[in-house]
Amino acid sequence: MKKIIELQNIKRNFQVGDETVHALRGISFTIYEGEFVTIMGTSGSGKSTLLNTLGCLDTPTSGEYLLDGVSVRTMSKPQRAVLRNRKIGFVFQNYNLLPKTTAVENVELPLMYNSFVSASERRKRAIESLIAVGLGDRLEHKSNQMSGGQMQRVATVSYTHLTLP
């Protein structure tokens, strides 16, 4: 099976005043294609730090992180942003929808960073995807006009198959 994510002795330290906080202490694991993984732990155990690392939002202090065989730790922020846009989808707890934009516009946003997708294709994909998840009647609604479940579907659509070239 193909390795999708591989972490080798990942450590992440933060400096808080005079104190060094060791958020991740030598995390190692591999996730193979087709596997589903759950990250669990008590408050303050490093779950968010680990997820931010896996999502290319943060870099480890030391260790090796390979995403689809590509070393992530030494990449620049712009390189990580491109990798994140092409390989990773997020559904945040608060959905991170832009409040003054419509469902279609929120779904289109991640594709704006994909130079292979034209504006008309981006809009077409967004509309088709929202219809597919039962939101055809909410295309032009803003987030404050949708239920929590509807917002979650908008967020899920925007960060899954739509980012593919």
Residue ranges and their predicted role:
Residues K2-L164:
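ABC family nucleotide-binding domain
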